[in-house]
Design a protein with these regions (language model features):
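Acidic (Asp/Glu)-rich catalytic clusters
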Residues: 44-50, 67-79, 97-106, 150-151, ...
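Catalytic domains of cell-wall/extracellular-matrix polysaccharide-remodeling enzymes
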Residues: 129-215, 219, 223
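C-terminal domain-boundary segment and adjacent tail
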Residues: 184-190, 251-292
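A short, well-structured edge-of-sheet supersecondary motif
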Residues: 309-339, 581, 587-591
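Active-site SXXK
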Residues: 328, 345-371, 398, 446-450, ...
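Active-site helix/loop module of the DD-peptidase/beta-lactamase fold
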Residues: 365-403, 425, 454-489, 493
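Active-site-proximal alpha-helical segments within enzyme catalytic domains
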Residues: 442-449, 489-510, 578-594
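Active-site Gly/Thr loop motif
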Residues: 472-474, 526-589
Length: 614
């Protein structure tokens, strides 16, 4: 009886949670001007780690940008925007463009101090000099700022404008919109962005000179937020220190004290309590602009979800999260146990599917082919005598786990420092292509090869090509002792990121009208290329194992780092219950994170309860 009550409570909590999410107020707390000073840099990280800030805008033209880069790379969970800059407002510190653009600067070569006319700075505003402004120079400068940020900061997701730089004329507004699309970024602060992304800018609901006024006015704003709506609040944290005490412009002289107040506001426990009490959900700009759409589940699916959660509890499965996407919209999501919505989860061998995507992209760019010989990439790591089987080993053999090994050599990574050399020095008793043996070190070799031919680690190669277009951020991937991403394991992503990847595969590599992964590669990687058996066995055992094929999702065929499933589905999976399950006949994706040893039992519950309701 107690177990049934617990199970129903969990199910009710899920349904309540989904409804609450769809009706919650969502708030982005954005902090601007990172890079303009050391004080702003430190305060930005402080208000992210210890406060409510979720997105930060960085200024590549400023002197403290290199320090900002270092700090942001140490905090990959902080969402970053490029704060496009055409003005330099402070009296005692100035910044200049990255490119030669005479129409954008004053006689000293600095950006003008103001965007709009200011009586203290006659003739020194962008708008007062519009007649001489060249749009081509604006584009040139914006491109330089964007590319500098993208080169150094992986988690850049969007563009914003310093002092209105992204929308001060219709032509500039359209330019920014075009650049954002070209670079795969969202664009905030231009005309129409609030409507495009369905949010509302909010500020202080009253006086905000002192800290107490800031808190009272900001809490007033929080209390006026309506359920089901999304909001964006921005301000500029820094410290009241010796550095900031020298910073001012006419009309804004108390910069240091004011920005210390912003820092204190964003870290205020009183403010945090109001946010919790009112059920306000803090998100970042990446989520605001690239989150998957939500839709209330059908009655049939809601009932099935109830039964599924109850069955998970009864089976004592340690499920951390599950997300179901149907017809491109999230219809079922839940986090439990140690699973957290906004924290990346270890994916184990789900990592392999992302490595396969990188290989497909490298092939499409002419950097690789399926028939390339593995030994050609590592001439300095080969054994003294290269055998016939090793000589025959190709990229395709690595992808299909048909390397010629009879046993998985992956444990070598626990004792060896040079994993490429260790792999190449193993015995290859069979002809490659004749035996399936699950082999994580083979996937590592794919990662090493991609790094060889692209000059980039897997994660850096995938950011502009896959992660950024899908809005996947805060990516972490473990590395080998020689600095190569593990490839076959060690990737950390959020549950929604898994769902996005599944949806991309379901859509044949297309995302929002663009071909992100080659369609033919998606078809090949998700098709049965070779017969397969569960990890720990090799295909010599296949005749015996096939007697239970109707009940097993590990005997349906293997593609390029993906498994075929029953029900004409395919999947990425990782040890302990990590799944991306793509079900084309239902136009659906199921993503899970977990700590479940019996993964067949885990997927069986999905087939039993959720599949019929999709």
């Amino acid at each position: 009886m107690h177990k049934n009550i617990l199970s129903r409570s969990l199910a009710t909590a899920f349904l309540f949670g989904l409804t609450a999410r769809m009706n919650a107020q969502e708030l982005v707390v954005r902090i601007d001007d990172m890079g303009c000073s050391h004080s702003a840099n430190v305060a930005s990280i402080d208000t992210y780690r210890n406060g409510i800030a979720g997105s930060v805008e960085v200024m590549p033209v400023c002197a403290w940008f290199p320090e900002a880069v270092k700090m942001l790379r140490e905090n990959p969970g902080l969402d970053v925007g490029v704060h496009l800059t055409l003005t330099s407002e402070w009296e005692n510190v100035k910044w200049r463009p990255l490119t030669h653009c005479p129409s954008l600067v004053d006689r000293d070569g600095n950006f003008y101090p103001m965007m709009n006319a200011h009586k203290a700075y006659p003739g020194q505003s962008v708008k007062e000099n519009l007649s001489g402004l060249k749009l081509a120079e604006v584009e040139q400068e914006f491109r330089a700022q964007i590319e500098l940020a993208l080169r150094h900061i992986p988690q850049v997701t969007h563009l914003t404008g310093h002092m209105g730089a992204t929308g001060f004329t219709p032509e500039v507004n359209e330019l920014v919109k075009r650049l954002a699309a070209e670079y795969g970024l969202s664009s905030i602060d231009r005309a129409g962005s609030a409507e495009d992304y369905s949010f509302q800018y909010v500020g202080y609901d009253g006086p905000h000179g002192t800290l107490e006024e800031k808190k009272a006015s900001f809490i007033g704003t929080l209390k006026k937020m309506e359920k089901g709506r999304r909001y964006l609040f921005l301000d500029h944290p820094a410290y009241d220190d010796a550095e900031m005490s020298t910073v001012f412009h006419v009309g804004y002289e108390n910069v240091a004290a004011d920005r210390q107040g912003v820092t204190d506001l964003l870290k205020s426990e009183e403010v945090k309590n109001v946010i919790r009490e009112r059920g306000i959900k803090l998100i970042d700009i990446n989520a605001l602009t690239k989150q998957l759409p939500r839709q209330e589940a059908t009655k049939k699916l809601a009932k099935a979800a109830d039964k599924y959660i109850e069955a998970v509890a009864q089976a004592k499965q340690d499920l951390h999260s599950i997300m179901v996407v149907k017809d491109g919209k999230v219809v079922f999501e839940k986090w439990m146990g140690s699973g957290k919505e906004n924290e990346p989860h270890v994916l184990n061998s789900v990592s392999k599917t992302f490595t396969s995507a990188a290989v497909g992209l490298a092939i499409s760019e002419g950097k690789l082919s399926l028939t390339d010989k593995v030994i050609s990439f590592f001439p300095d790591k080969l054994p003294a005598q290269v055998g016939e089987h090793l000589s025959a080993l190709t990229i395709r053999h690595l992808l299909t786990m048909n390397t010629g090994h009879e046993k998985d050599p992956s444990k070598l990574r626990n004792t060896e420092k040079d994993w490429e050399k260790a792999f190449l020095h193993t015995e290859f008793p069979r002809q490659p292509g004749t035996i399936f043996c699950y082999n994580s070190l083979a996937t590592y070799m794919l990662s090493a090869i991609v790094q060889k031919v692209t000059g980039q680690k897997l994660v850096d190669y995938l950011y502009p090509r896959l992660f950024r277009p899908l809005g996947i951020n805060n990516v972490r991937w473990q590395e080998s002792p020689t600095g190569v991403n593990a490839g076959g394991w060690g990737l950390f992503l959020k549950t929604e990121d898994l769902a996005k990847m599944g949806l991309l595969l379901l859509q044949g590599g297309q995302w929002q009208g663009k071909q992100v992964l080659p369609a033919d590669w998606v078809k090949e990687m998700s098709s049965a290329q070779v017969p397969c058996v569960p990890a720990g066995r090799n295909s010599d055992a296949l005749p015996q194992l096939m007697k239970n094929a109707k009940k097993s999702d590990w005997l349906q065929g293997y593609g390029y780092q993906m498994w075929r499933c029953r029900h004409n589905a395919f999947r990425a999976d990782g040890a302990a219950g990590q799944y991306i399950i793509v079900i084309p006949e239902k136009n659906a994706v199921v993503a899970t994170t977990a700590n479940i040893g019996n993964m067949q039992a885990e997927i069986d519950l999905i087939w039993k309860y959720l599949l019929p309701a999709l």
